Structure formats: C-alpha cells, structure tokens
C-alpha cells in the first residue's frame, strides 16, 4: 500500500452480500495498516473472517471456483456495470454534492481482484480481509487520504463478489458512528443483489454526502477546492 505523507487514520466498513456473506461472521475490531514507514489505526466494522475458530484455509474447490469467477469476468465488466452515461450522472451528483461541503467523494468500481489477491484469499487471509486491503490500497492510490481537512471518502465496489466498502479519512470518521456507515453500505448492498448499481451507488453517495454536509458544511462565500477528480474510476 503506497500512502504518502503523514500517517492517516481511516475507518473501513465492509458489508458483504452474495457469496461473501455466507463465509463470514460480523465482528468489530481494530487493526493496523502499514503506511510507508508509519502505521495508521483502522477501525473495522462488519465481517472480517469465517465463522468458528478463524481458520483461514478453504477447500480447493471453493478456492478454484472463486478464481474462475474473477478471471472469467467479461472484458470491461466495470464499464458494463456502470456504463459511461451512468458514470456521467454519478459524476454530476458528486459535483453537486461537493458544492455543499468541503469533503471529497471518490467512486471506484473494480471488476475482479488481481491474481496475487485471489491466491491469498481463503488461504493466507480471509476473503473479506483481502477485499478490505484492496479497498485501502485504492484509497491510497487515488490519494483520497490527501485532502486539506482529512475528510475524503472512498466508495469501493467489487463486482465479482458484489460487495462494497466505504473508506473514510480520519477527519470524517471521528465524527460519524459506525452505525451510520453501516446504513450507507447496507443501502448499496441490497441493490447489488439485483444488479441495480445506479440506485445503490446513488443512495450510498447521498448518505455520504449528508454526513459531509452535517460535519463539514461550506460557509457563506466558501467553495469546495475540488482536490480530487470526481469521475468514476473503472478498475
């Protein structure tokens, strides 16, 4: 994970649906994520491991099925799930949202995990933990952590597992209870099951926007500096 600058604290919230939901149990815990040569505290709400004694290894059949599910995702699957017209509408909603607060919202849609993460999932680490690390990696690559008020938020959608994570920088996460993040993620998770990505992403965006307006409203005469690109990221 390549996070530059000072160590930043973020809250990662995962709500699994579909195949992932059958493999994990909800817990609340605290972990550490390497940030260059420093560490940032990460609060995890949701499902972080399989039920029982925490055994990470899974059957060869299950591991193989996941591998093929990810590798057989159609070319440009992210663009098909969120086509250009939908992406433009989502970008317009982000633009409108950021006229009301000083935060930054980034939407990232990824078709499948890369091979190195697929190999680790269920063998070296639980699948939800691998997905969480992937979301945190995008949080760093897209520089969502690098905002003036530490109030950037990443909404990350992994199509192959139909699951979502919201990663928020410390400026906003310290103001917002876990229950609020869970509600935002659940709103998207319910629509993922039916493939209604537009409605789900819009609802999640509205939830995040409302929290940013509440805690980081723009004052009279102020303008959002738009520190990060508002276009949907297809990965």
What are these model-derived regions, one by one?
Residues 56-225, 230-234:
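Divalent-cation
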């Amino acid at each position: 994970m390549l996070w530059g600058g000072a160590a930043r604290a973020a809250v990662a919230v995962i709500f699994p649906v579909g195949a992932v939901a059958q493999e994990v149990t909800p817990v609340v815990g605290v972990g550490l994520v390497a940030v260059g040569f420093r560490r940032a505290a990460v609060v995890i709400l949701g499902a972080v491991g399989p039920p029982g004694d925490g055994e990470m290894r899974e059957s060869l059949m299950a591991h193989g099925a996941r591998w093929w599910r990810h590798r057989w995702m159609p070319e440009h699957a992210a663009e098909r799930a969120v086509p250009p017209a939908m992406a433009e509408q989502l970008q317009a909603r982000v633009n409108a949202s950021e006229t009301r607060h000083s935060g930054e919202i980034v939407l990232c849609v990824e078709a499948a995990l890369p091979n190195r993460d697929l190999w680790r999932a269920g063998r070296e680490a639980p699948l939800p933990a691998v997905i969480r690390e992937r979301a945190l990696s995008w949080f760093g690559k897209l520089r969502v952590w690098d905002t003036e008020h530490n109030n950037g938020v990443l909404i990350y959608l992994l199509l192959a597992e139909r699951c979502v994570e919201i990663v928020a920088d410390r400026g906003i996460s310290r103001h917002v209870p876990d229950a609020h993040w869970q509600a935002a993620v659940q709103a998207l998770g319910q629509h993922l099951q039916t493939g209604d990505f537009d409605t789900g992403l819009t609802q999640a965006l509205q939830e995040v926007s409302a929290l940013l307006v509440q805690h980081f409203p723009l004052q009279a005469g102020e303008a959002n500096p738009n520190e990060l690109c508002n276009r949907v990221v297809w990965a």
